[in-house]
């Protein structure tokens, strides 16, 4: 089972539909009013990477200090985990 913070990271990556940097994930967490700390989100991201739900895409991201940083995306296992947690959605 996933922790609350892990679910937040999975949801943010799923909603974005593109690879994100840590800073982008932190900004989206603030906008969604998740009460996670930046370090907590980073820790959960690494846990999800180790479990095979998230992977590092490339180092083409740029952070606020204009340095290159990793971008992360969901693996197939990560997408399956989201669909198992929330079920299939149908468009009307």
Feature-to-residue mapping (PLM):
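Short alpha-helical segments that sit at the start of domains
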Residues: 1-16
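Short, amphipathic alpha-helical interaction segments positioned at domain boundaries
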Residues: 70-92
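Short, Lys/Arg-rich nucleic-acid/phosphate-binding segment
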Residues: 58-69
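A short, conserved structural fragment
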Residues: 49-60
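Short amphipathic alpha-helical interaction segments
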Residues: 35-50
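Short acidic, hydrophobic short linear motifs in intrinsically disordered regions
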Residues: 19-30
